[in-house]
């Protein structure tokens, strides 16, 4: 049904922790989406292998070294087996209600666009995904988190 794709930052320090948390959360979604990590930044290939997701290194970049959005979509479309594509920031933890929302949108109309806004929560340690992590993280988010900017598009599903 769905391919999640992202261009992670290098997996160093705090960004390494939050991106690993996010990508692990994606692997736990049901139904399980196809997951593609794009680019060649440090750790991308290794993390893709660690989590059993696809790695596509080929991308076109701007002169400033930023990946081109059309290149991200083009490379994902070449290998994706799913009807819906969702670009998602590599630091966004997705919970089970995400797939419920995707399914609702898919049932209404094939030609859809879904965007989302993040909650900012400072998570400095790996999440214990063996525990009852979703309710615990949601409770922490409601207690300490803040809405991200309204202009932030942290995932775009089409």
Task: Please report, for each region that a protein language model flagged, where it lies by residue.
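Active-site-proximal specificity loops/subdomain of glycosyltransferases
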Residues: 37-85, 95-96
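Conserved catalytic core of nucleotide-sugar-dependent glycosyltransferases
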Residues: 77, 93-158
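Catalytic metal- and UDP-sugar-binding loop of GT-A-like glycosyltransferases, i.e.
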Residues: 88
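Short loop->beta transition adjacent to catalytic acidic/histidine clusters or analogous donor-positioning motifs
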Residues: 2, 24-36, 53
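Well-ordered, non-membrane alpha-helical segments in soluble/globular domains
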Residues: 16-23, 71, 97-101
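Short, charged/polar "capping" segments at the starts of alpha-helices
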Residues: 13-15, 42-47, 122-125
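Short, hydrophobic beta-strand segments that form beta-sheet elements in well-ordered domains
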Residues: 33-40, 114-115
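N-proximal low-complexity "stem/linker" segments adjacent to membrane-targeting elements
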Residues: 1-24
């Amino acid at each position: 049904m769905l391919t999640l794709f992202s261009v992670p930052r290098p997996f160093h320090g705090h960004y390494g922790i939050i991106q690993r948390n996010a990508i692990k959360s994606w692997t736990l979604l049901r139904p399980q989406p196809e997951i593609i990590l794009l680019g060649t930044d440090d750790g991308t290939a290794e993390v893709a292998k660690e989590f059993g997701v696809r790695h596509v290194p080929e991308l076109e970049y701007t002169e400033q070294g930023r990946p081109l959005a059309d290149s991200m979509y083009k490379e994902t479309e070449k290998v994706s087996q799913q009807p819906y594509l969702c670009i998602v920031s590599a630091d966004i933890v997705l919970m089970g209600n995400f797939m419920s929302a995707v399914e609702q949108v898919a049932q209404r109309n094939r030609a859809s666009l879904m965007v989302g806004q993040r909650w900012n929560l400072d998570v400095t340690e790996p999440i214990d995904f063996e525990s009852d992590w979703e309710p615990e993280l949601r409770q922490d988010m409601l207690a300490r988190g803040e809405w991200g900017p309204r202009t932030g598009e942290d995932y775009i599903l089409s």
